[in-house]
């Protein structure tokens, strides 16, 4: 693994003693505001958002190897985290311009890799929407953008975690059967691309290569993949990159995410951990809005703890150390 000693030390700060990244994701901004807005009539305030992130950091970071936060609303939470919990900070603006084609990436204009590092980040995380089948006119802009961030992170000697979310402009619903059919190729080809040395990515944060709701044995309705086909997609994903890679939870339930990790492991995917967000903490949002801070804290200490504890047990049996990847 051709990483600097400083980068290796930083990734170690984000991992547990077994070399597994069991990270809590709470860099949601737009999605979090929408979740909160479902339970109150007024617009969520900055103070409300910041305080919920603080609560989650105070209650759950003792069980996570690291936490991913955003520098817009998450800095108080970064100060509230457990002293042994590493810190990733997000560098991208939330969401994308729905009126423009291509879901082009955009950095937070007040931040840089240098500033995120000065803020105490052990790594920089950037989210990229990518469709390997989009036009070269769109994709060349995205490649150049990621090259810039990679070079910034090399200059600052800080790990670069690239999160890739796939899409297809011709299939508006990425939960559909149509998208499920094209997802494996889109996920795995994007991983292959951004593993190239020119991008200077250190860890990939990726989707599982199938929609588990359409896998035989998991599906309640239509089946898109047999178990064997789904397993092959996970195998293909593992050989698509030489880099450490971790799974995102994509908003599915805690139970489904844990079952997915077991399936991935049985299929032969040697993934190196997770950055799990809503599957762990989403139930706290409604409690926080409707019943207040103390009730939310109680939810985090009980259900939230169970979610993260169960996940950690599954990771112990399924994930492998990032140090084993070459």
Swiss-Prot record:
Alphabetical list of Pfam families matching this protein: DeoC (PF01791)
The protein's Enzyme Commission number: 4.1.2.40
Coiled coil stretches, renumbered: none
SMART domains documented for this protein: DeoC
GO BP annotations, alphabetical order: 6-sulfoquinovose(1-) catabolic process; D-tagatose 6-phosphate catabolic process; lactose catabolic process via tagatose-6-phosphate
Family annotation (HAMAP family): LacD (MF_00734)
Protein name as it appears in the record: Tagatose 1,6-diphosphate aldolase
Species name: Staphylococcus aureus (strain bovine RF122 / ET3-1)
